Amino acid sequence: SPKYIERFGTPRSLKSLKDHFQVHYCQQLGRENDYFEYMEEGKIKKVRTKALVSVNSTEAYTAACLEGLGIIQAPYSGLRDSLEKGDLVEVLKKYKAEAMGVYFLYSNRKFLARRVRVFMEWVEPYVKDYIYS
């Protein structure tokens, strides 16, 4: 966020991350993601980071970033409005994390209703456009 950049500056390289803070996300108590993840030559790479705060919800993750408590890595689609309004600023653009999957949940593949399959085929291009634009 601009608040973070004003306080700590803008990270310009992976090496500079040692001088910055990331909001750590933990799905399970005591098991936080304490790294910045990126893809290089088709492989996932990680740089260990320090944090001012660790959270366990996506709402708190984004809120902590907006308040200037650290850098986050999140899908563009979830931050689009904040980025367009200038509430958040993209940094280290060339270091993209592995793409997250989007899944359909349905009761049984063996007896998948035709209307469910048709809906999945219809919605797929819209979801792709939203996520990757």
Regions found by a protein language model. Name each.
Residues 45-90, 97:
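Hydrophobic hinge/microswitch elements
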Residues 16, 34-48, 82:
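Ligand-binding cleft/hinge of the Venus flytrap
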Residues 3-12, 30, 110-113:
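Short helix-loop capping/hinge motifs at secondary-structure junctions, enriched
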Residues 3, 23, 103-105:
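Residues embedded in well-ordered beta-strands
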Residues 14-38:
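Short loop->beta-strand "edge-of-pocket" segments that line small-molecule binding or catalytic clefts
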Residues 15, 76-85, 95-133:
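C-terminal effector-binding regulatory domain of bacterial HTH transcription factors
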